[in-house]
A protein has these predicted regions:
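Processing junctions and N-termini across compartments
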Residues: 24, 100, 121-124
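N-terminal pre-ligand scaffold of iron-sulfur
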Residues: 32-119, 135-140, 158-175
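Cysteine-rich micro-motifs
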Residues: 122-132
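Strand-loop microenvironment adjacent to phosphate/nucleotide-handling motifs in alpha/beta enzyme folds
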Residues: 143-145
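Short proline/glycine-enriched turn/loop segments at secondary-structure junctions
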Residues: 147-151
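Conserved SAM/SAH cofactor-binding pocket of Class I
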Residues: 153-156
Length: 175
C-alpha cells in the first residue's frame, strides 16, 4: 500500500511537470518550477485510523495546519521523531477528498516564519506577505497569482507524500 501511494505521488509529480512544460511552451517562454527551500524533515504519524479521522483530512476542502514549534494543532500527539518541514505542513483534502500535503513556508519569501494560509472563501492558499496565491485543492500547489506566478522561475509549494500502512496508519513524509 505504501508503494502504491509513493507511485501515485510520483505519477502526480510527473504529470505536474509535464503540464508545466506544456504550459511554458504554449506561452512561448521557458519557465521552470523552482523549489529551493532548505531541506527539512517531515514525519507526522497518525498511528490508527481513528487518529486520521480526528486529526487528518477525510473530505474535500478540509484543511489542517501542523506546526511542531507552535504545537499546532493543539492537542495533537507529536512524538519525539515528529518533524513538520521548513515552515509547517498544510494538510488539505483535494476536490476529490484525497489528502495532499504542502510545506507552509512561502516559496517566494523562503523564511520558515512567513507562511501560507488556507483561504476558506476561495479554497486556495495565500501568502499575506507577498500576495502570492496557490491552488492546493486541484493543482498540486501551483501558483495562480502574485509574485510566485509572475517570475520566470515560478515558485510552487513543496509537496510531501502521504503514505498508508497495513494497520490503518497514515504518515506524512518527505519523499
Amino acid at each position: 500500500m505504501v508503494m502504491l501511494t509513493v507511485f501515485r505521488n510520483l505519477v502526480r509529480n510527473l504529470a505536474v511537470a509535464a503540464v508545466c512544460v506544456a504550459a511554458g511552451a504554449a506561452a512561448g517562454g521557458c519557465k521552470h518550477v523552482s523549489d529551493d527551500l532548505p531541506p527539512a524533515g517531515v514525519w507526522i504519524v497518525f498511528p490508527f485510523e481513528h487518529d486520521w479521522r480526528t486529526w487528518g483530512v477525510t473530505a474535500p476542502l478540509q484543511h489542517r495546519e501542523f506546526i511542531l514549534s507552535e504545537r499546532l494543532p493543539q492537542g495533537f500527539n507529536y512524538s519525539a521523531a515528529s518533524q513538520t518541514g521548513y515552515g509547517g505542513v498544510l494538510l488539505v483534502g483535494d476536490i476529490n477528498g484525497a489528502p495532499a500535503a504542502y510545506d507552509m513556508s512561502c516559496p517566494v519569501e523562503r523564511k520558515p516564519d512567513i507562511r501560507i494560509a488556507y483561504d476558506e472563501d476561495r479554497n486556495d492558499a495565500f501568502c499575506a506577505h507577498c500576495g502570492s496565491r496557490y491552488s492546493v485543492i486541484n493543482n498540486y500547489g501551483q501558483p495562480t497569482a502574485g509574485p510566485a506566478a509572475e517570475r520566470d522561475d515560478y515558485r510552487v509549494l513543496r509537496t510531501y507524500n502521504i503514505a498508508t500502512g497495513p494497520n490503518g496508519e497514515y504518515r506524512v513524509i518527505r519523499p
